[in-house]
Amino acid sequence: MMTFHPSPPQLTLIKSMLFIAALLPFGRLALFTLTDQLGANPIEFITRNTGDWTLYFLCMTLAITPLRRLSQWNWLIRLRRMLGLFAFFYACLHFTTFLWFDHFFDVNEMLKDVVKRPFITVGFSAFVLLIPLAITSTNGMVKRLGGKRWQWLHRLVYVIAALGILHYWWMKAGKHDFEQPIIFGTIVAVLLLVRVFWAWQKRSKNNALAGTSDCRTG
């Protein structure tokens, strides 16, 4: 595959364009709200839209490492933090919609709903787990936690994605409409299996090298 190594100004431009593109769904939602184009059920439209974009950005975040390894475009890793933070941004909008329109900012009533309805329990759990990932996304937090601990913490993103998809599946179950949850689930499963395969491949290689070294020293 053709290698592409952007210069610092080019990378800044790419990041700026990605930032603007990532805000477009929010801009569209704001425009539809202001022009009364949210349809017959505005609350449902906003809730579904922000939930969908949370999952889109989670999938894009998870796709960065496989894309980087397959394309050898190491600079792609510089985009992962932004994509992850936009996943958190749309998750915050999704949660705010639930807290505002469903419970009018009554936290006690919201928590009762979280306990009572399993699909909300799952979605709320995913949102809560996203918070420490967003907080520790800075370079300073990477240094403070240490590389290994930071990596272990951020592997929670797969748990979060799985919980988000389960939340979506459960929500769609009432209408027997599983097409989109299946698509999201397949994407996340493939991305996870690719990483598992690479980890197994690396371990096998290390074991083979260790065996060769033992034979030589023996």
Curated annotation (Swiss-Prot):
Where is this protein localized, as stated in its record? Cell inner membrane
The keyword Cell cycle appears for this protein? no
The protein's matches in Pfam families, at most eight in alphabetical order, are given as: Ferric_reduct
> Which residues are the signal sequence here?
none
Keywords in alphabetical order: Cell inner membrane, Cell membrane, Electron transport, Flavoprotein, FMN, Heme, Iron, Membrane, Metal-binding, Transmembrane, Transmembrane helix, Transport
GO CC terms in record: plasma membrane
Task: Kindly give the InterPro entries that the UniProt entry links to this protein.
Answer: Fe3_Rdtase_TM_dom (IPR013130), MsrQ-like (IPR022837)
Cofactor: how bound:
Binds 1 FMN per subunit.
Q: Name its co-factor(s).
A: FMN; heme b
Membrane topology of the entry: Multi-pass membrane protein
Q: Its GO biological process terms? A: protein repair
How does this polypeptide assemble, per the annotation? Heterodimer of a catalytic subunit (MsrP) and a heme-binding subunit (MsrQ).
Report the family membership: Belongs to the MsrQ family.
Q: What is the recorded name of this protein?
A: Protein-methionine-sulfoxide reductase heme-binding subunit MsrQ
Report the source organism.
Herminiimonas arsenicoxydans
Q: Which gene encodes it?
A: msrQ
